[in-house]
Amino acid sequence: MSDYRRFIAYLYEYPNNRKGGCCGFVRVESQNGFCRMDFQIKSPSLPPETSVTVYGFIRRSGRMYGIPLGNLLAGRSSTSGKLFTHSDAIGQTDVTLDELGGLILLCRQTGVIATQWDDLPIQPEFFAPTLTQEPKTSAENGTRPTEEKT
């Protein structure tokens, strides 16, 4: 049980790239090399049946680079779902859970929902949805992240 880690991070809307109100939370659990993220979102700005793309992000050179983790499907009054990945190979990259700065959720119609756990402010205008790979020793030992829609 020594590798067990669990925390909750609150999700905020970022209308016009400014932090708005709290709209939900994500519970992140890591154990035995696997990471599970449980999302609960209540945002009237998310239209039903809208796809929400979830990215983990890391910070490099003043920018935030995304690692695609999966998609959630917005419900009528709320959005909930689970995403799974390896704790030491987030989104099949060489990035670990400990290196992530937080999560950014993008919805084409409504914009950005985000959380951070590295204690640095989120600036959506500096987000790039793809991580540029730097030369680093890595092993592709993960499986593709899966999702569960509820």
Question: Predicted regions span which residues?
Answer:
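N-terminal targeting/export leaders
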Residues: M1-T150
